[in-house]
Amino acid sequence: MKLRIRTMIWAAVLAVCLAGCSATGISGGTSDAGQVTTDFLEDTVFTVADMRVSLAEWYLYALPQAAEIENMYGTEIWDYPTDSTGQTMADALKEDIREQITYIKITGARAAELGLSLGEDDLFDINLQTEEYMSSLSEEQRLKYGITEDAVRQIYSDNVLAMKVYENLTLNIDTSIPDEQVRHMVLEYIMILKDYEDEDGEFVRYSDSELDSMRSDAEALLEQVLADSSITRLDEINDDRYSVVELVADLAELKEKLPGEIPEIAFSMRQDEITGVYETDDALFILDCVERTDETTTDKARIEIIEARQQALFEKKYGEWENEAVIKYNYKLWDSLGVR
């Protein structure tokens, strides 16, 4: 899948395939607390291996995210404590941004060893998006935060390379998935409960004779449905005694919502099959397989499973890279750094 660079820089950082990685507890490599701040250029926030993160780059990540949070919660949110240690919302976002940048830097740095680089189309898109982004900023914004075309271009380039690395490493992931794990069906069913609620709110079991009558009525209804060619779905039955429930689910979800052997029976039904009457301890069931395979939900589930496999594979590899990375902070700048 070709990455479409977003006009909002931070959205590219959180692109679907790379989203959530900072939330998994990535520590951002090995911190070198003994680094002397005079070793840094004045506007360097920190370095990841030999890669420098400038103040302008920091703000390009931070400002859009801070603005979105303020739009949602107001400007007072920054002093709000997020945990028992006294960490504030501003502290939490600062750490999250550091993790985002570190993640992109470490990942993109592996492009060369994998034989990956920016192609002509990538460079064209990067330059175009850089121009568009720069044109959206006022001169005051550029000067206040030191934002330059080079800084913007660097972020777009880093993100494209990181995406290329991700796709390269996860391209050949196993995509075979057992039917029972991924297939979603559309099931309609009538559930006839064996209990009723009395005036005191207590559930009372129907008498044996009443249950026999309910079974006979359900069997007669099923016979009527199967004999009437104009009825193709349970919800086409005109009988006020029964309500029809529709459920779109895989086998695991069927097991969560339906009792006994009903899930396995339903999941094995043929397309358009109406069958019953099945009995559990608490109810009678008539089942209708409206769609044996619901393509939309099945495809969505398949994609989610494959993406989870890709993410797990990539995070394992990233963990190895992270252990090799050394992060050095310009504490003179870092300690006073905000997100606005």
Give, region by region, the residue ranges found by the protein language model:
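Mixed-charge, low-complexity intrinsically disordered segments
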Residues: E68-S84
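Bacterial N-terminal signal peptides that target proteins for export
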Residues: K2-I9
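Peptidyl-prolyl cis-trans isomerase
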Residues: S22-D43, D50-V53, P81-R340
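Surface-exposed, interaction-prone regions with an acidic/low-complexity signature
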Residues: T44-T47, A67
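Short, compositionally stereotyped local motifs that mark structural "simplifiers"
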Residues: A11-A15
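Short, solvent-exposed beta-strand-terminating loops
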Residues: L55-M72
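C-terminal motif of bacterial Sec signal peptides marking the signal peptidase cleavage site
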Residues: V16-G20
